Amino acid sequence: MAADKIDTIVSLSKRRGFVFPCSEIYGGQRAAWDYGPLGVELKENLKRQWWRYMVTSREDVVGLDSSVILAPEVWVASGHVATFTDPLTECTSCHKRFRADHLEEAYEEKKGHAPENGLADLNCPNCGNKGTFTEPKQFSGLLSTHLGPTQDSGSVAYLRPETAQGIFTNFAQVQTTSRRKPPFGIAQMGKSFRNEITPGNFIFRTREFEQMEMEFFVKPGEDEKWQEYWMEQRWNWYTGLGLREENMRWYEHPAEKLSHYSKRTADIEYRFSFGGSEWGELEGVANRTDYDLSSHAKASGQDLSYYDQEAQERWTPYVIEPAAGVGRAMLAFLLDAYIEDEAPNAKGKLEKRTVLRLDPRLSPVKVAVLPLSRNPELSPKAKGLAQALRQNWNIEFDDAGAIGRRYRRQDEIGTPFCVTVDFDTLDDNAVTVRERDTMKQERVSLDQIEGYLASRLVGC
């Protein structure tokens, strides 16, 4: 995968309405992005597929939507106030700030070994000078705010850095009201916030992001087999939606780099091919043990254990957590789907064609309805067909420009099918359906078109 592919995706995203720079009319906000008409559809399709796979297609997982701002005591008990920090270093030459661990990891990935003298061996990625980094200091990743009319220590609150803690604090209520018993899971999607030192790489690392997390509660001693199970499930979800396995790998966190709550964490990494780093974390599957439930039980004085009626014993569940970022998943699917091939134009000459070979379940637009030309007879018929199909799918109507150019526009945004209403339609009540990847065309009767598309858009 070429290193400049990210730049191509950034350009395509802005030009076609997937992702825009935030507050661009004011010069932009660093590492903040707004999702345009196509981007929000792709993002919602991703979330819908995750929810269907992780929640509604299973009997052992239920959903939750907890608050973004939790009681500050939650973050003290969870360990985030004390330990949710990153090592911050500054280049004394250009005064750019970086995460020290990211600099060392990039060096190790490139050289195959850690720097012998730490930061002293590293060149600044910004100015190129060597040995100019300050001694790292711990920098809090929590974003804080104040609630109420006064701004003092008693009004401090935190924007959640993960959705997980809202699940843990609601564990007992969800378990009781849903009448579930371990092993079972609680899933949640929502916005989280982290005061990143070095956000960047488009939508990969941002201070405001959306998560898809599930906490799966199991009996202690059964946690390791369940972690293996969820690692396989999460890998299969990505490949099932089209990610190629040659662009994916597992990364096991070494013991010294595990989070404060983790017994074991394995990341699915994707070949993003960022400048200076080929691989990046796509999703983590962590064994959080009973750390969170035990910590909150101790701090709150509430019982968060589970009484096992069959074994007649009480225990605190261990937790397996698959945690994914919506933005990272979207970026991976865009990169993997993007191809350039050749297709004949109206004169039969081969021209470059840009295609997003997205799985139809993810495609922002499922079907484009295209009248062959702007015509008082064709346009109303095409608009009527588009409106009828909108009852089932997201449909785009386009009658501007040559038909070949309109096909290319749809290929570029990943639309799986184009339906052309032509002059023959007025006589035979049939339309031409063009498939995106093969460009094959098939004549389909109007009274069968809905069933034809439905059989090819299963799960959409």
Curated annotation (Swiss-Prot):
<dbReference type="Pfam" id="PF03129">
    <property type="entry name" value="HGTP_anticodon"/>
</dbReference>
<feature type="binding site">
    <location>
        <begin position="209"/>
        <end position="213"/>
    </location>
    <ligand>
        <name>substrate</name>
    </ligand>
</feature>
<dbReference type="GO" id="GO:0005524">
    <property type="term" value="F:ATP binding"/>
</dbReference>
<comment type="similarity">
    <text>Belongs to the class-II aminoacyl-tRNA synthetase family.</text>
</comment>
<feature type="binding site">
    <location>
        <position position="162"/>
    </location>
    <ligand>
        <name>substrate</name>
    </ligand>
</feature>
<feature type="binding site">
    <location>
        <position position="99"/>
    </location>
    <ligand>
        <name>substrate</name>
    </ligand>
</feature>
<dbReference type="InterPro" id="IPR002315">
    <property type="entry name" value="tRNA-synt_gly"/>
</dbReference>
<dbReference type="GO" id="GO:0005737">
    <property type="term" value="C:cytoplasm"/>
</dbReference>
<dbReference type="InterPro" id="IPR022961">
    <property type="entry name" value="Gly_tRNA_ligase_bac"/>
</dbReference>
<dbReference type="InterPro" id="IPR002314">
    <property type="entry name" value="aa-tRNA-synt_IIb"/>
</dbReference>
<keyword id="KW-0067">ATP-binding</keyword>
<dbReference type="InterPro" id="IPR033731">
    <property type="entry name" value="GlyRS-like_core"/>
</dbReference>
<dbReference type="InterPro" id="IPR006195">
    <property type="entry name" value="aa-tRNA-synth_II"/>
</dbReference>
<keyword id="KW-0547">Nucleotide-binding</keyword>
<keyword id="KW-0963">Cytoplasm</keyword>
<keyword id="KW-0648">Protein biosynthesis</keyword>
<feature type="binding site">
    <location>
        <begin position="204"/>
        <end position="209"/>
    </location>
    <ligand>
        <name>ATP</name>
    </ligand>
</feature>
<dbReference type="GO" id="GO:0046983">
    <property type="term" value="F:protein dimerization activity"/>
</dbReference>
<dbReference type="InterPro" id="IPR045864">
    <property type="entry name" value="aa-tRNA-synth_II/BPL/LPL"/>
</dbReference>
<comment type="subunit">
    <text>Homodimer.</text>
</comment>
<feature type="binding site">
    <location>
        <begin position="281"/>
        <end position="282"/>
    </location>
    <ligand>
        <name>ATP</name>
    </ligand>
</feature>
<dbReference type="GO" id="GO:0006426">
    <property type="term" value="P:glycyl-tRNA aminoacylation"/>
</dbReference>
<dbReference type="InterPro" id="IPR027031">
    <property type="entry name" value="Gly-tRNA_synthase/POLG2"/>
</dbReference>
<dbReference type="InterPro" id="IPR036621">
    <property type="entry name" value="Anticodon-bd_dom_sf"/>
</dbReference>
<keyword id="KW-0436">Ligase</keyword>
<protein>
    <recommendedName>
        <fullName>Glycine--tRNA ligase</fullName>
        <ecNumber>6.1.1.14</ecNumber>
    </recommendedName>
</protein>
<dbReference type="InterPro" id="IPR004154">
    <property type="entry name" value="Anticodon-bd"/>
</dbReference>
<dbReference type="GO" id="GO:0004820">
    <property type="term" value="F:glycine-tRNA ligase activity"/>
</dbReference>
<feature type="binding site">
    <location>
        <begin position="194"/>
        <end position="196"/>
    </location>
    <ligand>
        <name>ATP</name>
    </ligand>
</feature>
<dbReference type="Pfam" id="PF00587">
    <property type="entry name" value="tRNA-synt_2b"/>
</dbReference>
<keyword id="KW-0030">Aminoacyl-tRNA synthetase</keyword>
<feature type="binding site">
    <location>
        <begin position="321"/>
        <end position="325"/>
    </location>
    <ligand>
        <name>substrate</name>
    </ligand>
</feature>
<comment type="function">
    <text>Catalyzes the attachment of glycine to tRNA(Gly).</text>
</comment>
<feature type="binding site">
    <location>
        <begin position="325"/>
        <end position="328"/>
    </location>
    <ligand>
        <name>ATP</name>
    </ligand>
</feature>
